[in-house]
Amino acid sequence: MQRPLPEGQIKKRDVNLTMKRMKKRVLTAALLLAFAVTATFASAGDTETPKPSLPAIKIDGNITLTGKMDDPLWLQAMPVELTWEIMPGENVPAKQKTLAWMLYNDDYLYFAFRCYDSVPSAIRANLSDRDKMFGDDFVVVSIDTYNNYQKGLEFAVNPYGIQGDLIMMGSGNEDPSYDMVWASAATLDDEGWTAEMAIPFSVFSFNSADIQDWTITLCRSMPRDSRYLLSCPMHDRNNPSWLGQ
């Protein structure tokens, strides 16, 4: 069984150059579920509705991962709700409430999910090896650092904090052989479950632009009588590109 690593045990790599580039940058994250979208904003002359987005808030210090979101630094984060069911229903209101948060510092991207469930006994969770938890309930973060819909890295956690990570291509094909060192924690309770992640910037490659525009997707998967995917915003099933939604 893989045990989630405490954040303090993550081995830091030589990321001096990366951190110098990141210190004065603002990460803009488009927060949705299951399929990546472009993190863009409508200009004054645009007539299209801008896609949902959320500023990435920088913090001082490191978050202690407990799976309970009890570190005071989380109070600085802005929540987003995954309001739509995109599978099996097509853009219908989500039947369960899910909130997500994101923060960052010079070393890590932090994510948290609060997954409410009206029937907590239906939550599926197993203690398993890495990458063997995708049959459970899980939350997943997909990150496309170049915002070009070609490739994204995915980081998933089940209600026991068991990790899964892989590479997703724009076509939807996945490579589960991808394994990196990052931290996670999760807990179950009477109202559902909560998960936290700390992903070091050292696992990513990205361009040298002063302003970074990344696509960051947040997903909740719920296997019940069917597998339910909950999303914020709607998903276009006519778009063949998984990352180019």
Predicted feature residues:
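Short intrinsically disordered, low-complexity coil segments enriched in acidic
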Residues: M1-L5, L27, F206
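Bacterial N-terminal signal peptides that target proteins for export
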Residues: L17-A30
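Structural preference for beta-rich elements and adjacent junctions enriched in aromatics
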Residues: A42-Q245
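Bacterial N-terminal signal peptides
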Residues: A29-A39
